[in-house]
């Protein structure tokens, strides 16, 4: 007997959703939520945030004529319900997989995705740009930005709101508040007030009243100002929207973000209002799945889990992530040095600092999504004789370029930059790849750069940085794990700046490996030796200071050399190294293995490496082919 179709089975695009009666929307929300739970329990992905926006997403596509009306999602990891309703339901099981759906909005995937996102705080700027463009060409469509309560506190979001309040363009910002941080008045009074504020009757007669006051001689303008202050004061007492009104936004809320029918009715009213409007809704991360409701941080991003109780595989306990090494080592150092501080821009969990924060809360500074502030803040701490470890993802450090230059490197302030997720990050994709950092770090005055090729290197560098105060220093490492048994957290090893390792010496070709490329370099060297070639393998962990003289000496007796760099070829280490080669050695350079200057899409690191021929086997094949072409034979 054929299974009866669900409501969701009949919906592939928003136009079909809009044909569903309003009273059926709660059932659709239930089915969308169950679809996400069923799918992600098998494959993993961003979880709690997506469960929290199901009703909002259904309401948005029900009320607005998408894609003509523009939805701009901030960050974007909460767009799985959006993807389900915009023609990608049957592909959700490929999300974050190689050649599958992106975990974020992506223009190439769908006309419903306006921008490729991944970083926080951009949506209001983009929505305002859309609204300004619309009005310039005299078109007619709605523009809606959806932003979370953490993202709206970013400097960029506040700058955009300030500009939007000045321009007075018709646009809607939906504040998705799931932490209750600015939401104390959810209930009948705020609901009653919102019904008044959004009514056509109220807004029409308010405009008439204020227009009348402007025409009154002498007392008119003063009376208008008085009544506006009374109106604002009344709303400030009953709602938390004073800040947004001060920025020039009409404020509605807080509203229950899980009452889809009320959301639809409220959005229908809000879209008829003039000027910039902020609709504040309250949601719960993990809504509808008990384990995620109880621990939304744990279930923010999940691996495959048992649907019945949310149990996830603990993974390989013999390995430890580079991020966890950082947190563990900083805790060890802080035990004996009260001047150490760890700084992170809203990435305590991701940067491996959870246990550190619990053990040394007064030494941990989570500055929020404020990368620019975090770098200047760290620089100033050094002026107070504090030893700051600035823990940040490579992709987010690019947001603080001006502060890196002016507030740290030009003044030679000894900030310790601990740069996580450098190189290829895998499933997070193009907006999170850490492929730019070496290019700009090596261009900064005074900045020392260390690229560990293993976990012990990272431990040794973190310990060495504690006492190093001559300049700022950056260490960068991949999103990867290492064998725990290979590590000694208490070993006292003195790093020697400007040194490198030589694993083997040969005469045909030298492989110069930069940091995390060492594993592929070792595989390539073994393959080349199996083909009868004599290989030099150099593990170049110090980029600045660079042991240029010693490196040139190593290359004297080889016929040619290649560089292996997990960065963009045009903005990595190649130019930096070649500028320091002798003329004789410079002529021996044949190739850099790195990423071409194009967006590097998501997939497991191994798959991405194979696509771009950066795995050991592919490197060996290409090197052997070049040597054969140039008559360098075994």
UniProtKB/Swiss-Prot annotation:
Cofactor: how and how many bound: Binds 1 Mg(2+) ion per subunit.
Biological process according to GO: 1-deoxy-D-xylulose 5-phosphate biosynthetic process; isopentenyl diphosphate biosynthetic process, methylerythritol 4-phosphate pathway; terpenoid biosynthetic process; thiamine biosynthetic process
Alphabetic keyword roster: Isoprene biosynthesis, Magnesium, Metal-binding, Thiamine biosynthesis, Thiamine pyrophosphate, Transferase
Residues binding thiamine diphosphate: 77, 118-120, 150-151, 178, 289, 371
Source superkingdom: Bacteria
GO MF terms held by the record: 1-deoxy-D-xylulose-5-phosphate synthase activity; magnesium ion binding; thiamine pyrophosphate binding
Keyword NADP belongs to the record: no
EC number: 2.2.1.7
Reactions it catalyzes: D-glyceraldehyde 3-phosphate + pyruvate + H(+) = 1-deoxy-D-xylulose 5-phosphate + CO2
Cofactor requirement: Mg(2+); thiamine diphosphate
Broad EC category: transferase
Pathway(s) where this gene product acts: Metabolic intermediate biosynthesis; 1-deoxy-D-xylulose 5-phosphate biosynthesis; 1-deoxy-D-xylulose 5-phosphate from D-glyceraldehyde 3-phosphate and pyruvate: step 1/1
InterPro entries cross-referenced by the UniProt entry: Dxylulose-5-P_synthase, THDP-binding, Transketo_C/PFOR_II, Transketolase-like_Pyr-bd, Transketolase_C, Transketolase_CS
Cellular component GO terms, alphabetical: cytosol
Keyword check for Glycoprotein: no
Gene3D superfamilies (UniProt xref): 3.40.50.920, 3.40.50.970
PROSITE patterns: TRANSKETOLASE_1
Binding locations of Mg(2+): 149, 178
Function: Catalyzes the acyloin condensation reaction between C atoms 2 and 3 of pyruvate and glyceraldehyde 3-phosphate to yield 1-deoxy-D-xylulose-5-phosphate (DXP).
Entry's family note: Belongs to the transketolase family. DXPS subfamily.
Subunit structure: Homodimer.
Protein name as catalogued: 1-deoxy-D-xylulose-5-phosphate synthase
């Amino acid at each position: 007997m054929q299974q009866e179709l669900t409501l969701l089975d009949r919906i592939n695009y928003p136009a079909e959703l809009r044909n569903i009666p309003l009273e059926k929307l709660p059932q659709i929300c239930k089915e969308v939520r169950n679809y996400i739970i069923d799918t992600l329990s098998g494959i993993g992905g961003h979880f709690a945030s997506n469960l929290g926006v199901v009703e909002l997403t259904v309401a948005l596509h029900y009320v607005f004529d998408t894609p003509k009306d523009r939805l701009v999602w901030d960050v974007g990891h909460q767009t799985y319900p959006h993807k389900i309703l915009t023609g990608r339901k049957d592909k959700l099981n490929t999300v974050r997989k190689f050649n599958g759906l992106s975990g974020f909005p992506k223009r190439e995937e769908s006309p419903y995705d306006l921008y490729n996102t991944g970083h926080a705080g951009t949506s209001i700027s983009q929505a305002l740009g859309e609204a300004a463009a619309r009005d310039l060409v005299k078109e007619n469509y709605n523009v809606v930005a959806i932003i979370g309560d953490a993202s709206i506190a970013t400097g960029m979001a506040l700058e955009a709101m300030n500009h939007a309040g000045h321009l007075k363009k018709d646009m809607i910002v939906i504040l998705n508040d799931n932490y209750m941080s600015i939401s104390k008045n959810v209930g009948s009074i705020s609901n009653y007030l919102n019904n008044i504020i959004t009514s056509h009757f109220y807004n029409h007669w308010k405009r008439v009243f204020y227009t009348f006051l402007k025409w009154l001689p002498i007392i008119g303008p003063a009376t208008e100002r008085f009544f506006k202050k009374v109106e604002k004061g009344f709303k400030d007492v009953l709602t938390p929207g004073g800040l947004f009104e001060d920025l020039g936004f009409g404020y509605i809320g807080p509203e229950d973000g899980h009452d889809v029918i009320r959301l639809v009715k409220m959005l229908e009213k809000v879209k008829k209002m003039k000027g910039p409007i902020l609709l504040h809704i309250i949601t719960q991360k993990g809504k509808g799945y008990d384990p995620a409701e109880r621990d939304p941080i744990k279930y923010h991003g999940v691996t495959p889990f048992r649907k019945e109780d949310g149990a996830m595989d603990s993974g390989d306990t013999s390995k430890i992530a580079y991020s966890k090494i950082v947190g563990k080592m900083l805790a060890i150092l802080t035990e004996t040095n009260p001047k150490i501080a760890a700084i992170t821009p809203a990435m305590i969990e991701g940067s491996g600092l959870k246990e550190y924060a619990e053990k040394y809360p007064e030494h941990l500074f989570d500055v929020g999504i404020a990368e620019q502030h975090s770098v200047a803040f760290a620089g100033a701490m050094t002026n107070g004789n504090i030893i700051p470890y600035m823990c940040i993802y490579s992709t987010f450090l690019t947001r603080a370029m001006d502060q890196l230059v002016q507030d740290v490197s030009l003044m030679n302030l000894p900030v310790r930059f601990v740069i996580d997720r450098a190189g290829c990050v895998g499933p997070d994709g193009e907006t999170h790849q850490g492929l730019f950092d070496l290019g700009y770090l090596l261009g900064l005055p005074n900045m020392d750069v260390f690229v560990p090729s293993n976990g012990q290197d990272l431990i040794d560098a973190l310990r060495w940085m504690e006492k190093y105060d001559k300049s700022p220093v950056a260490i960068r490492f991949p999103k990867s794990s290492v064998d725990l048994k290979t590590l000694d957290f208490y070993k006292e090893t003195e790093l020697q700046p400007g040194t490198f390792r030589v694993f083997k010496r040969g005469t045909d070709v030298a492989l110069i490996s930069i940091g995390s490329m060492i594993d592929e370099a070792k595989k390539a060297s073994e393959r080349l030796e199996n083909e009868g070639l004599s290989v030099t393998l150099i593990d170049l962990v110090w980029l600045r200071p660079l042991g240029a003289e010693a490196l040139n000496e190593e290359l004297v007796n080889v016929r040619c050399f290649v560089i292996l760099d997990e960065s963009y070829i045009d903005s990595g280490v190649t130019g930096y190294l070649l500028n320091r080669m002798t003329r004789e050695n410079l002529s021996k350079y044949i190739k850099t293995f790195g990423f071409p200057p194009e967006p590097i899409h998501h997939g497991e690191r191994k798959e991405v490496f194979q696509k771009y021929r950066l795995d050991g086997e592919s490197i060996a094949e290409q090197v052997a082919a070049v040597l054969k072409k140039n008559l360098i034979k075994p």
